Amino acid sequence: MSQTVNIVGAGLAGSEAAYQLAQRGIKVNLIEMRPVKQTPAHHTDKFAELVCSNSLRGNALTNGVGVLKEEMRRLDSLIISAADKARVPAGGALAVDRHDFSGYITETLRNHPNVTVINEEINSIPEGYTIIATGPLTTENLAKEIVDITGKDQLYFYDAAAPIIEKESIDMDKVYLKSRYDKGEAAYLNCPMTEEEFNRFYDAVLEAEVAPTNEFEKEKYFEGCMPFEVMAERGRKTLLFGPMKPVGLEDPKTGKRPFAVVQLRQDDAAGTLYNIVGFQTHLKWGAQKEVIRLIPGLENVDIVRYGVMHRNTFINSPDVLNEKYELIKEDRIQFAGQMTGVEGYVESAASGLVAGINLAHKLLDKGEVIFPRETMIGSMAYYISHAKNEKNFQPMNANFGLLPSLEKRIKDKKERYEAQANRALEYLENYKKTL
């Protein structure tokens, strides 16, 4: 095979696409600007660096992203293989040691005979077959060219990353180990709050100083990664029904449910670092320290990485992409990752998997690959190419609402999800036989 594919961006989507192509014998130029040029959110030169949470979310098949992960496992996903190898305790979720995770992916691709890594910034779309997977922090020059080629105005909103703290600095006498509803292993440290403690914390959040943004950038948040101070502005109960909800987290010492709970999730394999679940923030660093130290057990906590915020860019996919993540008017170009309107680590990798397999099949004259809508991976591809509300196209997580209804209605939600999951995997196995 003499044709070489260019993949711009070695994040989750670009790395997955590169692997799928390379495994099928296609030569790949994997172009990544880091470390030559860093982004405001990245900290390393590794591929597929996790810049927000270290969790790939739920692993159960009663969870949309759990179904998507299982589909990807069965399709030889590099990202899911790396996640399984780098797993750390997280109850029913699949969380990873972020360094082991990205390290495994980086080594796999750098050592692959069909992958050539090029570290440079790209300011224009390369000639030939190209997958653009530059993510939410696409550089200005490349973003302008993408706008020109798609014919659409650029859309953007803000993503936020939660602070990471040292376990040794947590007052373990004030916290307890438990997963919500005791699902899976007890993997979260829980900081219980009385009503008085919550009110003091809430008032401090409202008064805390927020980092400035450029005037021309209108803040537009995706609900799944909203700063907790923005949630707080929506009302006192928003946090209590969001990241601080106490339901299913009764204190084992007292047997009683706290008024509010802040959860801490293990962030590394050694168990020395924890992130504050749902506390992605845009507060100034000094304000972050003051607010976090009002949480019981964290009065003297050491913060090893403060929360940060960065812009997130995505295109109006339903108008410009098809289910193969190809640009409709110039199908030598594909997009993959968050900029297509899939939201989340796993979803981004899945889009890269679909784009990579499709391009390999095209170059090998094996026909197109359209995964069934009954599969989660197929339903995501269908969503980004068919969502009709173009004026307000929003990023989407994997969820059962994207799948077609079952022939026979099942009232119980858990049973319905199980049936949809079983159907998805059955359809996937049948479709795999055609690949």
From Swiss-Prot:
Question: What SUPFAM superfamilies does its record include?
Answer: FAD/NAD(P)-binding domain
Question: Which residues are FAD-binding?
Answer: 9-14
Q: Where is the signal peptide?
A: none
> Which cofactors, by name?
FAD
One GO process term, biological-process aspect: tRNA wobble uridine modification
Question: What residue intervals traverse the membrane?
Answer: none
- Keywords on this record? Cytoplasm, FAD, Flavoprotein, Methyltransferase, NAD, NADP, Transferase, tRNA processing
As its record notes, the protein acts as a catalyst of: uridine(54) in tRNA + (6R)-5,10-methylene-5,6,7,8-tetrahydrofolate + NADH + H(+) = 5-methyluridine(54) in tRNA + (6S)-5,6,7,8-tetrahydrofolate + NAD(+); uridine(54) in tRNA + (6R)-5,10-methylene-5,6,7,8-tetrahydrofolate + NADPH + H(+) = 5-methyluridine(54) in tRNA + (6S)-5,6,7,8-tetrahydrofolate + NADP(+)
Where does this one sit in the cell? Cytoplasm
Q: Does the keyword Methyltransferase apply?
A: yes
Q: What are its E.C. numbers?
A: 2.1.1.74
Q: Name one GO cellular component term.
A: cytosol
Q: Cross-referenced InterPro entries, in alphabetical order?
A: FAD/NAD-bd_sf, MnmG-rel, MnmG-rel_CS, MnmG_N, TrmFO
Enzyme class per UniProt: transferase
Any one GO MF term held by the record is: tRNA (uracil(54)-C5)-methyltransferase activity, 5,10-methylenetetrahydrofolate-dependent
**Chief place where the protein resides:** cytoplasm
What's this protein's family per the entry?
A: Belongs to the MnmG family. TrmFO subfamily.
Function text = Catalyzes the folate-dependent formation of 5-methyl-uridine at position 54 (M-5-U54) in all tRNAs.
Which HAMAP family does this chain map to? TrmFO
Identification of the protein by name: Methylenetetrahydrofolate--tRNA-(uracil-5-)-methyltransferase TrmFO
Q: Which organism is it from?
A: Staphylococcus haemolyticus (strain JCSC1435)
Q: Give the gene that encodes this protein.
A: trmFO
